[in-house]
Amino acid sequence: MSTMNLILMGLPGAGKGTQAQKILEDFDIPHISTGDIFRAAIKNETKMGLEAKKYIDAGNLVPDEVTNGIVRDRLAEADTKNGFLLDGYPRNIDQAHALKQIGEELNKPLDGVINIHVEPAVLVERLSGRFICRTCGATYHKLYNKPKVEGTCDVCGGHDFYQRDDDKPATVKNRLDVNIKLNTPLIDYYGQEKLLYNVDGDRDIDDVYKDIKKILDNL
């Protein structure tokens, strides 16, 4: 296949970052995450970057047209000639329509949207399992990375652990609910556009990637 213009979707904790890394190792395309391109546009003082900075400094949300402009500028760069892996954009249907238009203008239409699906209950368990040693700051996970001796820190031998507010189940569930509301219309839209590929993310990292690679090899 000559190009590979992709979007990677998935809820927090679904393993998007890990799978993005694996895609980049196998395919010669840049990983374009909205956070990174915003920071770069602001640092380089591009027209759109300066525009975005005004909103961010005032504590306001950056409007779609500015976000779309920053994405368009990034997709017009030379390193996207073989394709790109978009992460964190689009966030809503208006942005999805804008991306379609950008793709037509730059002759870089989307080839596929990979959605890593994991049930929210599993994600709550993954994301809310983290706890920290109060004495030395070592981090543990109740499922994936327990201390060797229960209740005792491997690093300093301390017994006092705590959980950050961000990692508490109610907070995690709230964050997931917000993301589900954002993602569901996009998943429906890309399903209708015949661009959507759902991958079961509740498995070993390598098994998930095998499925993703199979999809990409056949695009």
Curated annotation (Swiss-Prot):
Enzyme class: transferase
Keyword Zinc: yes
LID: annotated span: 129-167
Subcellular location: Cytoplasm
Catalytic activity, reaction form: AMP + ATP = 2 ADP
List of residues binding ATP: G13, A14, G15, K16, G17, T18, R130, T139, Y140, R203
EC number annotated for this UniProt entry: 2.7.4.3
GO molecular function: adenylate kinase activity; ATP binding; zinc ion binding
Sites where the protein binds AMP: T34, R39, N60, L61, V62, G88, Y89, P90, R91, Q95, R164, R175
GO terms classed as biological process: AMP salvage
HAMAP family for this protein: Adenylate_kinase_Adk
Family to which this protein belongs: Belongs to the adenylate kinase family.
Official protein name in the record: Adenylate kinase
Gene transcribed to yield this protein: adk
